[in-house]
Design a protein with these regions (language model features):
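GH16 jelly-roll
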Residues: 2-358
């Protein structure tokens, strides 16, 4: 009898440990809490690409293909005045030079001459070389004042899904990779219209950017490797849906006055008090580590382009000292610590290089 009780006790403890490991693993994959994925039909629509957009049978995921005929993409069915936009994404593998996979918000189809935009753009590479990516922000058509930063990743984004997210509120913008905030833009009064203020839609696309994406256009898309497949799943859209608040004939109207009377205060309050709107001390440390190890260009340190940094730039002396006046790294485009980190990873593959350790 005693042996039976002891056996049950051991089994119960083992089950608790297994459950804890599963919960921790889930958090590492999802990265952020309070994310409510939608079905494709709930809030998304086919943008372009004919048969190159393939939805899963459960309508929870979608594949975007690029072949020699066309790329593909989807768009949110509504426009949002501020929001949290998130997806688990897996990128194509092997040779991907010239390819761009983009997850972004924009209103360029509506406000053609003064559009707003928030970008996460993945830039393909030669086989054996890693994907790179950039974030960017435009407000009120300020495309001549790009605010891009470029980075490497601490994992292979073609091997498994990782969550990429954009938070846009009235006061700040945060770009996330899993549970790590990689960039925060705090709104400053001096930014004026350069801070995105008009309703935007969510977009996801894959397309041929051979003219610039890899080594400045030196290497283009090789369609002998096609089709190139990017996968999106567990897509989340949280925000103030302004399309539902407009009369039918005014949907997608390019008159900003049609949107000004829509009250988004409750939605904004929800966004600004949610977990993904607050950077904890551990997450701030993870963001600092990420930027130290993986950021290789920042417009804030590009003094040739901007003799005076744009008003939202926070100049970190230790960070600035690693960059040339072109905004690029001094050390031949490579962080000196990265080589040591690679050696450590080879010794201990289970230890993440960057983690918020929530």
């Amino acid at each position: 009898m005693r042996d039976s009780i002891y056996f049950l006790w051991i089994n119960n403890r083992l089950m608790v440990i297994i459950m804890m490991v599963m919960i921790i693993s889930c958090r590492c994959v999802l990265g952020l809490e309070n994310i409510n994925p939608i079905f494709f039909d709930e809030g998304l629509s086919h943008l372009f690409g004919e048969g190159n957009l393939i939805r899963s049978p459960d309508d929870r995921s979608v594949r975007l293909l690029l072949d020699k005929y066309t790329g593909s993409g989807f768009i949110s069915s509504s426009m949002y005045q501020h929001g949290f936009f998130s997806s688990l994404i897996k990128l194509p593998g092997a040779y991907t030079a010239g390819i761009v996979v983009a997850f972004y918000t924009s209103n360029g189809d509506v406000f053609v001459k003064n559009h707003d935009e928030l970008d996460i753009e993945f830039l393909g590479n030669l086989e054996g070389k890693p994907w790179r990516f950039q974030t960017n922000m435009y407000g009120n058509g300020s495309t001549n004042r790009g605010r891009e930063e470029r980075y490497r990743l601490w994992f292979d984004p073609s091997k498994e899904f990782h969550r990429y997210s954009i938070l846009w509120t009235p006061t700040k913008i945060i770009f996330w990779v899993d549970d790590v905030p990689i960039r925060e833009i705090v709104r400053k009064e001096e930014m004026q219209g350069d801070y995105p203020q008009k309703p935007m839609s969510l977009y996801a696309t894959i397309w041929d950017a051979s003219s610039w994406a890899t080594s400045g256009g030196k290497f283009g898309v090789d369609y002998t490797f096609s089709p190139f497949v990017s996968e999106f799943k567990d897509i989340a859209l949280d925000g103030c849906n302004v399309s539902d608040s407009l009369p039918g004939e005014n949907n997608n109207n390019n008159n900003i006055d049609n949107y000004n009377n829509i009250n988004c205060s409750l939605s904004d309050q929800f966004l600004m008090t949610n977990d993904y709107s607050t950077i904890t001390p551990k997450q701030a440390a993870a963001m600092r580590r990420f930027r130290e190890r993986y950021m290789y260009y920042s417009y804030c340190y590009d003094t040739i382009r901007y003799s005076v940094p744009p008003p939202e730039c926070v100049i970190v002396t230790a960070e600035k000292n690693r960059f040339r006046d072109t905004g690029r790294l001094k050390f031949g485009g490579s962080h000196p610590k990265v080589h040591k980190a690679r050696k450590r990873r080879r010794r201990n593959r289970s230890t993440p290089v960057v983690s918020a350790d929530l």
